[in-house]
Regions:
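N-terminal substrate-binding region of glycoside hydrolase catalytic domains
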Residues: 81, 107-112, 154-310, 319-325, ...
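Mature N-terminal, pre-catalytic/accessory segment of carbohydrate-active enzymes
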Residues: 1-2, 6, 11, 15-192
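Charge-rich, solvent-exposed alpha-helical interaction surfaces
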Residues: 29, 33-36, 305-308, 350
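Flexible, charged surface loops at secondary-structure boundaries
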Residues: 140-141, 200-203, 406
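Short acidic, gly/pro-rich beta-turn/loop elements at beta-sheet edges
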Residues: 93-94, 219, 271-275, 381-383, ...
Length: 448
């Protein structure tokens, strides 16, 4: 378990400070005052926001009791293949004695009717299926999810829940250890002041910087900084060389000072690149929007952004970013991660898709990078999801989605505002504030 408190003045996104917490299973919760999370249950099928499935697909949701338990889905030591291991007490009758491995895209909820198996193995109570990863090719499986099936009457019958590769760091050529910061003191930095002595004078050793991803996309906006053509997974992407030069300057300057960097990936609206906005988020009016990992065009761009940033910011030439936060206060649905109203399970699942995508992309280049979700201080207020969800409820739902499809070491970037936010003496709370902030896992608010 890694626990670090980053005190960041995040005026741009309205965050005074946050606690970063990372654990393999999130066994304990923020600030060290909570006892734990109940064992998650299989993801429940949600209703209204689900797209209707084509008749030419094999559903992998709502299929009843799973016949196969997946034990692991990991990159093998050679770095070119992965292995999915599983077990079952028995198998249904089928056309042959084989188990088949089928691949699905991040955005798919069902196996296409014309799917071709990528591996097969004999039916055994303990089994392993191996296939090529094909990293950074048009057929890459780094971001895919996989199901085990048998063939029945010439069609594939899915026996397992989808599973992603859970150790993308095995592909990374950069594996320097996570740095130990000299101090927890940090700032959201102003690039115009990086040339001054302010960071040194203040003793800052942690820094955060916002990356609205649509700024990266498109041709350069300055003749001195050529447009960057980045090829990933067989496709070319046009990136703004002028914007990239800004990030180069910021991250290189901070790295040279021995400052641990946190990049906050935000999904701003761009008329030129609507595909990065989730289909349930278009037409809204907010600061930032939900990432689109629900459609092919969106996932392609998000994969390319994740790969470019992680590949570029892992060396001394451009600076080293070790912390990546996906979105800002995503439980505040209407403002910071806009999506039209959906139930919390649907919302969590769509966010989990995006986090998983960034996780696999970033860690495939930087093995010890850390990836976080972002929640605010409204822990257990029984909020109406017309605008926001309680942080605890969303974290539980998100954790359920992640564990169901292959557990990973995600972290929590928590924003522990004082309550009320205009009250600076957070250690002296009386009246309503004293009732809202308690040392209990059922507290309404979690503050510093």
């Amino acid at each position: 378990i890694y626990l670090a408190v980053l005190l960041l003045i995040l005026g741009v996104i309205g965050t005074a400070m946050f606690i970063v917490y990372q654990s393999e299973n999130i066994g304990k919760q923020v600030a060290g005052i909570f006892e734990g999370i109940e064992e998650v249950q299989p993801e429940q099928e949600s209703g209204s926001a689900e797209a209707e499935q084509s008749e030419k697909t094999h559903s992998v949701k709502g299929t009843g009791e799973r016949k196969v338990t997946i034990l692991s889905c990991e990159v093998l030591p050679d770095g070119t293949q992965f292995a999915l291991k599983g077990e079952a007490d028995a198998f249904p009758e089928s056309d042959d004695n084989n188990l088949y491995l089928l691949a699905m895209k991040t955005y798919e909820d069902a196996v296409p009717e014309d799917a071709v198996p990528i591996a097969r193995a004999e039916k055994k109570t303990s089994f392993m299926l191996k296939a090529d990863i094909l990293d950074n090719t048009a057929d890459s499986r780094l971001y895919s999810k996989f199901v085990v099936a048998v063939k029945k009457d010439g069609k594939y019958e899915v026996l397992s829940t989808p599973q992603y590769i859970t150790n993308p760091e095995a592909l990374a050529s950069y594996s320097e250890p996570y740095p130990k910061a000299e101090s927890i003191k940090g700032l959201l930095v102003d690039p115009q002041k990086l040339g001054t002595s302010e960071l040194d004078d203040l003793g800052v050793k942690q820094a955060a910087y916002n990356i609205p991803i649509a700024r990266l996309l498109g041709p350069s906006t300055h003749s001195d900084y050529p447009t960057i053509i980045y090829n990933y997974n067989g496709k070319d992407y046009t990136l703004n060389g002028h914007v990239v030069s800004e990030y180069d300057y910021v991250f290189k300057t901070l790295s040279d000072k021995g400052i641990v960097i946190t990049a906050i990936l935000l999904n701003n609206k761009s008329d030129a690149y609507p595909q990065v906005i989730h289909p349930l988020s278009r037409g809204g009016n907010a600061y930032y929007y939900a990432f689109n990992a629900a459609e092919e065009a969106g996932t392609d761009y998000l994969e390319a952004v994740a790969a470019f940033l992680a590949e570029r910011y892992r060396d001394e030439e451009h600076g080293i970013v070790m912390n990546w936060i996906i979105g800002n206060e995503v439980n505040v649905r209407s403002t910071w991660n806009y999506m039209k109203y959906v139930d919390i399970d649907t919302y969590a699942r769509e966010y989990a898709r995006a986090v998983r995508l960034f996780y696999n992309g970033i860690k495939s280049f930087n093995a010890n990078a850390r990836i976080y979700i972002s929640l605010d201080q409204q822990w257990n207020r029984n909020l109406s999801s017309d605008s926001s969800y309680d942080s605890r409820d969303l974290m539980d739902a998100f954790n359920e989605c992640i564990k169901e499809e292959g557990n990973i070491q995600w972290g929590l970037a928590h924003h522990p505002y004082s309550y009320p936010m205009t009250w600076p003496k957070f250690w002296e709370l009386t009246g309503e504030a004293g009732e809202m902030v308690q040392e209990s896992e059922d507290t309404s608010m979690v503050t510093i």
